[in-house]
Amino acid sequence: AAAVGAVGLIENSHTRVIDASTAHRTAPGWVYGFPELYKDPAQTIGTARFIANPGCHATGFLAAAAPLAALNVLPRDYPLTCFSLTGYSGGGKKMIAEYEAGDKGNELYSPRIYGTTLKHKHLAEMQKISGLEAPPVFCPVVDDYYRGMATTIQLHNRYLRGQPTARELSLILAAYYAKQPLVSVAPYSDQPAYLAANALAGTDRLELTVSGHEGQTIVTARFDNLGKGASGAAVQNMNLMLGFEETRGLVL
């Protein structure tokens, strides 16, 4: 409500806005600020007046799912599920204080599932920007570390168009992001036994890892919820809007 009110106070036609709240992410007249999802981000983002900065969980989900939907590999009616692990900084000042209190409860030392009503505030943008007919069944989890995210979608390959293997899906995503300075796809042959959610903490990059076999695939996006999942994306969008180098001021 505050963001809507603030934008309403603008009385001229040349002020440009990047809104980091949820208020305008699916609103008419606003451009969704995920440059890598556009064929010409310098044009789409660079000329926009109103940019809605993506949500952190939505960033990971869309990085994995949106290209596959756009390329017609992922059917629009596919019943997607998504699991997303975040550090506690994603919960804002109140949650940070809870986790950093000296007398915090024992439950705060373990991962905690939330959003169990399946009405998370990022679902609307997840569905709209991916172009899916329904939002994913989304399970967010917060854990006892400060920053970093790992967002994963799960796929049954036989329901995808062309029935690609996990290796082929990795190549498809790698080709899609080949020229992007801030989003990359790990080589399929480089599959660690563990994927640490805080591996990219302190950076503004996002890395996709595709794992699985002929029948099933998981695609995991790892990034910093405070970087590519928040302020890093805002700076990237600002750079494009001002005609600067896209990565200016960002940590690669």
Model regions and ranges:
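C-terminal helical cap and adjacent loop that interface with cofactors, partners, or active-site loops
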Residues: 178, 197-252
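N-terminal Rossmann-like NAD(P) cofactor-binding subdomain of oxidoreductases
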Residues: 1-114, 211-213, 248
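Active-site catalytic microenvironments for nucleophilic, acid-base chemistry
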Residues: 67-71, 156, 240-244
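A generic structural motif
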Residues: 19-22, 184-189, 249-252
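C-terminal substrate-binding/catalytic lobe of Rossmann-fold NAD(P)-dependent oxidoreductases
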Residues: 79, 83, 88-219
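Alpha-helical scaffold segments in soluble metabolic enzymes
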Residues: 63, 67, 125-129, 233, ...
